[in-house]
Amino acid sequence: MDFLNKHSSCISKLFSCPSQWQLNAAPGWQAIAAWALIAAGGFFVISRALLFGRVLLSLFVLPGKSLRSFGPKGSWAVVTGASDGLGKEFALQLARAGYNIVLVSRTASKLDTLSDELTSKYPSVQTKVLAMDFARNQDSDYQKLKELIGDLDVAVLINNVGKSHDMPVPFALTSEEEMTDIVTINCMGTLRVTQLVVPGMMQRRRGLILTMGSFGGLLPTPLLATYSGSKAFLQQWSTSLGSELAPYGITVELVQAYLITSAMSKVRRTSALIPNPRAFVKSVLSKIGRNGGSPGYAYSSSPYWSHGLMAWFLTCVTGTMGKLVVGQNRSMHESIRKRALRKAEREKGKKST
């Protein structure tokens, strides 16, 4: 006891040393933590800057693969949804590049007109046409397509056929017919055509498969829920297919696109964000193999410059799945729906008078 009383002050100092050491060392640890945060922030900023630089190079500087690398002169390109808009423009530009064209769409008269236009502009180009309604999903139609392309060297497949809603609509109010048509055309139509074309490409160990995606598949899109889901499905399917077919020398890309002037988008006026089909298709075919604004998505591309910048901003800055982004998307489509309903009422009133 005397020992404890005698040395109590020393013992007290001894046991107070760790806390005193912690107090003295705290500024050092704070400095280390601060530098660690600065380093992490710097790494984040630099990595984002390098990624953005890569996007700019891909969009504006670096060329894509040559179209001729996918097949020799005299090989064929199959284009679905070929009678209008993007499909028609893909057919025109691929014919200009020297490919023979198989045109597949619903309306026979439009296909015949386009076929005549192609052979008139490019006399050396051959065409074949098949009128089929993808919404019907008939085995007989796909059998006809199989027989049509059976002996052809199909080097390019453009999966362009697609359908959206007539106007933005809550899922609960979506008609069963519209819902079924969207899924059948966008998903089953694309899968079944691709499955007919792929075996020949695998045998020849070359080919190009472009599937038209949408920002609706990149961003959850309220009031276009079924369409958005179908395009998200194509994103996952195409990416998986791209990995499967890469060992066979086949290039697979899902093309992420914002609005384009077309009958489906119902947009008629071009702008910096909304190109016409000619400008858009030119960007797609000149940037094959480049991610454009989609560096984080394997086997995908956003090749048109403004779409690419928007895709980069959404995926790398704001994110695509957050409540704020999805909420803004909902508000935009609610506004579009209101305008569409008012327009329908006006047209209904004009017809009744």
Swiss-Prot record:
Q: Where is the active site?
A: Y227, K231
Q: Which PANTHER family match?
A: HYDROXYSTEROID DEHYDROGENASE-LIKE PROTEIN 1, VERY-LONG-CHAIN 3-OXOOACYL-COA REDUCTASE
What GO cellular component is one of the record's annotations? endoplasmic reticulum membrane
Q: How does it sit in the membrane?
A: Single-pass membrane protein
- Please give one Pfam family short name: adh_short
In short, the EC number is 1.1.1.330
Tell me the pathway. Lipid metabolism; fatty acid biosynthesis
Q: Where do the TM regions start and end?
A: 33-53
What function does this protein fulfil? Component of the microsomal membrane bound fatty acid elongation system, which produces the 26-carbon very long-chain fatty acids (VLCFA) from palmitate. Catalyzes the reduction of the 3-ketoacyl-CoA intermediate that is formed in each cycle of fatty acid elongation. VLCFAs serve as precursors for ceramide and sphingolipids.
Keywords, A to Z, come to: Endoplasmic reticulum, Fatty acid biosynthesis, Fatty acid metabolism, Lipid biosynthesis, Lipid metabolism, Membrane, NADP, Oxidoreductase, Transmembrane, Transmembrane helix
Q: Per UniProt, what is one GO molecular function of this protein?
A: ketoreductase activity
Q: Which GO terms describe its biological process?
A: fatty acid elongation; secondary metabolite biosynthetic process; sphingolipid biosynthetic process; very long-chain fatty acid biosynthetic process
Q: What is its main location?
A: endoplasmic reticulum
In the record, the note on similarity to other proteins reads: Belongs to the short-chain dehydrogenases/reductases (SDR) family.
| Reactions accelerated catalytically | a very-long-chain (3R)-3-hydroxyacyl-CoA + NADP(+) = a very-long-chain 3-oxoacyl-CoA + NADPH + H(+)
Source organism's superkingdom? Eukaryota
Kindly list the places in or outside the cell where this protein is found, as annotated in its UniProt entry: Endoplasmic reticulum membrane
Amino acids binding NADP(+): V78, D133, D141, N160, Y227, K231, I260, S262
Q: HAMAP family under this entry?
A: 3_ketoreductase
Recorded protein name is: Very-long-chain 3-oxoacyl-CoA reductase
